[in-house]
């Protein structure tokens, strides 16, 4: 019985798709088609007019980008600077540092 209910629901969805495709070609489906031309006309040598939403989104994503870059640089700086061991000054000898021996006066 469950196979029949699945088959019936599949047929119902298929019928809806078929009807919506037929209505779309007739213009009854509520689909709005653009009426030719571009929506925002390009202007020669002028900046495009941005909406407040576009300005907000660009500032948000640029702030997020800089946060991510600075966060990664602060916490994983060896990824940028390299994986070189930092020299330990306690292992250097006086001779390597150019310090004369104590007995010379």
UniProtKB/Swiss-Prot annotation:
The keyword Transcription does not apply. This is NADH dehydrogenase [ubiquinone] 1 beta subcomplex subunit 2, mitochondrial. Residues 1-33 form a transit peptide. The gene is NDUFB2. It is a peripheral membrane protein. Residues 93-105 have a biased composition (Acidic residues). InterPro entries: NDUFB2_animal. It comes from Gorilla gorilla gorilla (Western lowland gorilla). Keywords: Electron transport, Membrane, Mitochondrion, Mitochondrion inner membrane, Respiratory chain, Transit peptide, Transport. One of its GO terms (cellular component) is respiratory chain complex I. GO terms for biological process: mitochondrial respiratory chain complex I assembly. Coiled coil: none annotated. Residues 85-105 are annotated as: Disordered. Pfam families: NADH_B2.
């Amino acid at each position: 019985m469950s196979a029949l209910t699945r088959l019936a629901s599949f047929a119902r969805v298929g019928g809806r798709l078929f009807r919506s495709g037929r209505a779309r070609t007739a213009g009854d489906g509520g689909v709005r088609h653009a009426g030719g031309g571009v929506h925002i006309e390009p202007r020669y040598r002028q900046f495009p007019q941005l909406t407040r939403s576009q300005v907000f989104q660009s500032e948000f994503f640029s702030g997020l980008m800089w946060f991510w870059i600075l966060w990664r640089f602060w916490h994983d700086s060896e990824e940028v600077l390299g994986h070189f061991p930092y020299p330990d000054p306690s292992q250097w000898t006086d001779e390597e540092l150019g310090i004369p021996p104590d007995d010379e006066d």
